[in-house]
């Protein structure tokens, strides 16, 4: 009778310790993505200051997101073999430098260099931070990924709001104030890095005990390609909102820049809520169901959006953000379970592709807007969620025994 009692204590202590780390890494994800989201939020200022067209705006997004995407799988592969606990703080230092450069960039080329620094910082941050979230999950991988992601989405929602009330009134040089946010994140990530360093050995042992799916390599590769296509459909649509929605509202409805930024904030807030809901729901009903609903299920609303009034545009974008954003946590955890023991590589690959698809999409949509109209862009993008039909070809890898308890 005495032996079960000591065994029960570690179970209660471990989750309490993990929640602190999960909260810290989620907060830093929020700070990182807040700083990332400042870039599209200040596009109207940059467009006026440097006399840019939509194609050049798209190139800014392309530069930032490609630098953020190309390094992520590489960072993930390296850290799978040899973890780098303090790379989190180093990555945020790159972001800090980029913000300071952007605040005083004398030319358009200097703007591109600055946003590249911000992108490199993000590419270093995401694979290792996702690994820390999984390590601190206590076996509740869906919940941990959801909490981690909702921090990022909350930051993405807050960035445009802060830009509307800080950068728009005070100009481009006020971007330097956001370097304070990056410094705070560096301090927190240094503490997280120390915790991570102390748990690396435990993490290595857990990786060797990873579950196997029993699915052939060919099917795993096919499933990964399908998941990437789902990320493509989701992220290209979302980047059409984050990069061009303010211009769409100003052009179609004649709203002010600040009002358009507030509409964008509402959309991003709905996306943050959807991200938080998606993880726990995926743990309960299965991640494939979440992917079905979050991508294909949003199709009727995206098809209606280009023809809606201002009021219904806001209603529809809230629904789209809430439903579509729930997909990414499910996709990442599903991919991690497809390839056990490769958390860094898988996280880097999918975060990287998410950024890369977004960057390429932003550039192409910018060119499309210049050659046609901003309204036409949203008519084209409205069909992207139809790619969600590919979810039917994903394998079933979520047996009922694969639960947090069994972990």
Describe each region flagged by the PLM.
Residues 37, 65-73, 156-157, 268-276, ...:
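Residue-level signature of mid-helix packing/kink "hotspots" within the transmembrane helices
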Residues 51, 83, 104-109, 138, ...:
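Helix-breaking motifs and short loop linkers at transmembrane-helix boundaries and internal kinks
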Residues 114-151:
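Cytoplasmic helix-loop-helix junction between adjacent transmembrane helices
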Residues 148-195:
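Helix-loop-helix hairpin linking two adjacent transmembrane segments in secondary transporters
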Residues 282-331:
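C-terminal transmembrane helical hairpin of 12-TM major facilitator-type secondary transporters
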Residues 70-109:
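Conserved MFS/SLC helix-loop-helix module at the cytosolic interface between two early adjacent transmembrane helices
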Residues 39-40, 222-272:
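Extracytoplasmic gate region of multi-pass secondary transporters
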Residues 180-206, 391-396:
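C-terminal membrane-cytosol helix-exit motif in multi-pass small-molecule transporters
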């Amino acid at each position: 009778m005495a032996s079960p009692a000591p065994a029960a204590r570690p179970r209660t202590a471990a989750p309490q310790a993990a929640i602190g780390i999960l909260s810290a890494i989620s907060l830093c994800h929020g700070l990182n993505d807040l700083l990332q989201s400042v870039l599209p939020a200040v596009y109207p200022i940059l467009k006026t200051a440097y006399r840019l067209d939509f194609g050049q705006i798209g190139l800014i997004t392309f530069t930032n997101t490609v630098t953020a995407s190309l390094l992520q799988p590489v960072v993930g592969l390296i850290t799978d073999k040899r973890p780098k606990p303090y790379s989190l703080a180093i990555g945020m230092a790159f972001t800090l430098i980029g913000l300071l450069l952007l605040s005083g960039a004398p030319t358009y080329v200097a703007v591109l260099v600055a946003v590249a620094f911000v992108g490199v910082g993000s590419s270093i941050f995401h694979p290792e931070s996702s690994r820390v979230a999984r390590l601190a999950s206590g076996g509740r991988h869906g919940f941990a990924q959801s909490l981690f992601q909702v921090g990022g989405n909350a930051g993405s929602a807050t960035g445009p709001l802060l830009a509307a009330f800080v950068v728009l009134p005070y100009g481009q040089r006020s971007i330097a104030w956001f370097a304070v946010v990056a410094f705070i994140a560096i301090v927190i990530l240094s503490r997280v890095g120390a915790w991570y360093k102390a748990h690396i050995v435990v993490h290595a042992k857990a990786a060797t005990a990873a579950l196997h799916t029993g699915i052939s390599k060919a099917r795993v590769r096919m499933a990964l390609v399908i998941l990437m296509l789902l990320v493509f459909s989701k992220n290209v649509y979302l980047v059409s909102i984050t990069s061009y929605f303010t211009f769409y509202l100003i052009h179609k409805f004649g709203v002010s820049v600040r009002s358009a930024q507030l509409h964008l904030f509402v959309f991003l807030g709905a996306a943050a809520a959807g991200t938080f809901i998606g993880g726990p729901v995926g743990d309960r009903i299965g991640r494939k169901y979440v992917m079905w609903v979050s991508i294909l299920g949003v199709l009727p609303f995206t098809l209606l959006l280009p023809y809606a009034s201002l009021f219904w545009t806001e209603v529809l974008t809230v629904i789209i953000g809430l439903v579509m954003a729930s997909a990414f946590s499910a996709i990442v955890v599903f991919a991690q379970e497809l390839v056990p023991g490769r958390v860094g590589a898988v996280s880097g690959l999918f975060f990287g592709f998410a950024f890369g698809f977004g960057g390429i999409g932003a550039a192409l949509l910018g060119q499309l807007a210049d050659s046609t109209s901003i309204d036409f862009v949203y008519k084209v993008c409205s069909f992207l969620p139809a790619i969600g039909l590919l979810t039917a070809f994903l394998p079933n890898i979520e047996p009922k025994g694969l639960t947090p308890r069994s972990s």
